Amino acid sequence: MAERPGPPGGAVSATAYPDTPAEFPPHLQAGAMRRRFWGVFNCLCAGAFGALAAASAKLAFGSEVSMGLCVLGIIVMASTNSLMWTFFSRGLSFSMSSAIASVTVTFSNILSSAFLGYVLYGECQEVLWWGGVFLILCGLTLIHRKLPPTWKPLPHKQQ
């Protein structure tokens, strides 16, 4: 049985969801919402794996570490780093823009690093650091929101 060709870029066409009204903007149609969710999910996972890679590298190259723990830390660092790049590339393919994916990964990496630093090393972050995280979160909220255009198209002149 032959499969029907889809639209370019892996986008979901309106014919795939006939119950979606055509007047909905593209970012609110059924397939676009699903793609956005998976884009954000993959970017959050990429940030968490990046923080885990950094934490395992810090454990592996500590001053009082045995050779076996050092080798284990390097293996964990390499595997989590490859998982981070895999999830980041998948997040890029699902996201609406590379800026959204990059900022989402950065935010996830910062929060995951703070959590792992607290759990593994007892590190606490200062108020200024949390203020920076809040500003990044505000920026993320702004770029993930998609407002409808407020301008109306001009009527075409007939010659």
Swiss-Prot record:
InterPro entries for the chain: TMEM42
GO cellular component, one term: membrane
Membrane topology: Multi-pass membrane protein
Record keyword Isomerase present: no
Ranges that cross the membrane: 37-57, 59-79, 100-120, 124-144
Source superkingdom: Eukaryota
Keyword Transmembrane helix annotated: yes
Subcellular location: Membrane
Cystine pairs: none
Protein keywords: Membrane, Transmembrane, Transmembrane helix
Chief localization: membrane
Protein name per its UniProtKB record: Transmembrane protein 42
